[in-house]
Swiss-Prot record:
The keyword RNA-binding applies. GO terms for molecular function: 3'-5'-RNA exonuclease activity; tRNA binding; tRNA nucleotidyltransferase activity. The gene is rph. Phosphate binds at residues 87, 125-127. It comes from the Bacteria. PROSITE patterns: RIBONUCLEASE_PH (PS01277). Homohexameric ring arranged as a trimer of dimers. This is Ribonuclease PH. Phosphorolytic 3'-5' exoribonuclease that plays an important role in tRNA 3'-end maturation. Removes nucleotide residues following the 3'-CCA terminus of tRNAs; can also add nucleotides to the ends of RNA molecules by using nucleoside diphosphates as substrates, but this may not be physiologically important. Probably plays a role in initiation of 16S rRNA degradation (leading to ribosome degradation) during starvation. Keywords: Nucleotidyltransferase, RNA-binding, rRNA processing, Transferase, tRNA processing, tRNA-binding. Its EC number is 2.7.7.56. Signal peptide: none annotated. Belongs to the RNase PH family.
Length: 241
């Protein structure tokens, strides 16, 4: 199947990752996946949420937002609305869960690492790109803390990355762009670690249900895409070792 942008059904969009995109963050990247662009930056604080005080355990959390003209029509800032939108809350919780799944919290001490994901251009897949980019930003932050003697070791227990898969015009397609995502019959977001385990599976039918066989095909295609993302991540993180 040839797609509108010339890709085959099993191809990711072109991906570029720029590490150290922000000078002041403990770790940061700009991830570009097709026309989708997200800045992922990490800040460390010497404190933890109330429920973790005096536990000796750290915390990783995330915030997600979109610039007003990251979208075709202006998206109102959450700050102007006076509250975080339900969509933003859902996405930032997903990002936080995904990152915590691959970190040994005890290795952080009583420190928090806050990951900010700011979408500067949205062409579908912003939440999955945020997860993939945030892993690298967090890796860079942890490496910096180890080099400074603040952390005694790298706290990661695995890699984590994410990708979207859609059923578009009856075809299962990897990493859909906006036009495909907008018209999709079914949308999936898949998060995996490099042990081949699923961290999260989100799947929603838009008017037409899907079969177990279709789900199996989606998972297989998504895993193949995520394996490619792991290799891209390693291209940034391994030179830091």
């Amino acid at each position: 199947m040839q797609r509108g942008d010339g890709r085959n059904f099993n191809q990711l969009r072109p991906i570029t990752i720029t590490p150290g995109f922000q000078s002041f963050a403990e770790g940061s990247v700009l991830i570009e996946q097709g026309k989708t662009r997200v800045i992922c930056s990490v800040s460390m604080e010497d404190r933890v949420p109330q429920f973790l005080r005096n536990s000796g355990t750290g915390w990783v959390t995330a915030e997600y937002s979109m610039l007003p003209r990251s979208t075709v029509t202006r998206t109102q800032r959450d700050s102007s609305a006076g509250k975080i939108s339900g969509r933003s809350q859902e996405i930032q919780r997903l990002i936080g869960r995904s990152l915590r799944s691959c970190v040994d919290m005890a290795a952080l001490g009583e420190r928090s690492f806050i990951v900010d994901c700011d979408v500067i251009q949205a062409d579908a897949g912003t939440r999955t790109a945020s997860i993939t980019g945030s892993y690298i930003a967090l890796y860079l932050a942890f490496k910096k803390m180890v080099d400074m003697g603040i952390l005694s070791k790298m706290p990661f227990t695995s890699q984590v990355a994410a990708v979207s898969v859609s059923i578009f015009k009856g075809n299962i397609v990897l990493d859909p762009c906006y036009d495909e995502d907008f018209q999709a019959e079914v949308d999936f977001n898949l998060v995996m670690n490099d042990r081949g385990e699923f961290v999260e599976i989100q799947g929603t039918a838009e008017g037409k249900a899907f079969s177990r066989d279709t789900l199996d095909q989606v998972l297989k295609l998504g895993e193949a895409g995520i394996r490619q993302l792991f290799d891209i991540q390693k291209g940034i993180t391994q030179p830091q070792l």
